[in-house]
């Protein structure tokens, strides 16, 4: 007599075994590759290599995070500064700005300072601008007809100086150094220095825009004709000055240079992000 619900005659089946017996997609690929007469391993390696792509990073010598540390490179910073300074010049003197540049000033103690230079028909303006607060800190106005000499050349230092800088510079004289007092010469904060020394800004290579406004040769090519025109216009007043352009080494008299060594290594003269503090 048979019993309802009896499982006699049924055999247990392993689902795992059935799954292993079924061909996978990789097996199909291997079969196709085998039919083509090629080694599956080498075919798989060549397929992995084909999905890789090597490209050169733009500006490999200038990492993006380095340029972002300088507030002047932030979007709209230099444009805001120039518009502020143009408005200030228009209100105070009524002159029109012919051009502007972003350079590094090197004072008589070899300290670097970030400066914006603006040129009008009559005046050279050397501006210290705070790119963090977006406000002008100081403006030094130099009449073009007072500039008597321009010196172009490489920087030279006394033998014992700690902070010797390479590269070329530009020095603009608007007075004689013979009457420069010893007290002013040895005062790092003196405002009676009869000249100003400039070199190119470190962010020159970050973009085409900064390449144009940070290039020292571009500034010189505009400054020299402007000074000559100013001298011609003031010739009737009996000044009789002529611009002298020299090509010779530029001496920076820092015999020890410890203060500038520390300041320049830490970029204290620039509006720079320094961790959670920027100054």
UniProtKB/Swiss-Prot annotation:
Annotated stretches, region: Disordered: 1-49
Segments forming domain hSac2: 72-259
Keyword Cytoplasm: yes
Chief location: cytoplasm
Keyword match Cytoplasm: yes
Location(s) in or outside the cell: Cytoplasm
Name of the protein described by the UniProt record: Tumor protein p63-regulated gene 1 protein
Gene giving rise to this polypeptide: Tprg1
């Amino acid at each position: 007599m048979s019993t309802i619900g009896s499982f006699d005659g049924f055999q247990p089946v392993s689902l795992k075994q059935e799954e292993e017996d079924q061909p996978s997609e990789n097996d199909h690929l291997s079969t196709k590759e085998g039919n083509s007469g090629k080694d599956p391993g080498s075919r798989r390696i060549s397929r992995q290599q084909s999905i890789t792509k090597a490209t050169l990073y733009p500006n490999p010598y200038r990492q993006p995070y380095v340029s972002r540390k300088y507030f002047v490179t932030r979007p709209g910073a230099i444009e805001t500064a120039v518009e502020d300074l143009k408005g200030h010049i228009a209100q105070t003197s009524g002159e029109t700005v012919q051009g502007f540049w972003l350079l590094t000033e090197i004072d008589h103690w070899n300290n670097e300072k970030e400066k914006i230079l603006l040129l009008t028909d009559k005046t050279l303006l050397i501006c210290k601008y705070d790119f963090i607060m977006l406000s002008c800190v100081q403006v030094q106005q130099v009449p073009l007809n007072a500039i008597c000499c321009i010196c172009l050349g490489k920087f030279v230092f006394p033998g014992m100086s700690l902070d010797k800088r390479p590269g070329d510079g530009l020095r603009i004289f608007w007075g004689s150094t013979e009457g420069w007092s010893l007290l002013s010469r040895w005062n790092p904060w003196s405002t009676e220095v009869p000249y100003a020394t400039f070199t190119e800004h470190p962010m020159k290579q970050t973009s085409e825009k900064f390449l144009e406004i940070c290039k020292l040769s571009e500034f010189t090519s505009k400054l020299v004709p402007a000074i000559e025109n100013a001298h011609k216009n003031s010739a009737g007043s009996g000044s009789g000055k002529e611009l002298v352009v020299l090509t010779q080494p530029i001496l920076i008299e820092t015999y020890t240079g410890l203060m500038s060594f520390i300041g320049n290594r830490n970029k204290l003269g620039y509006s720079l992000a320094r961790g959670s503090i920027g100054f």
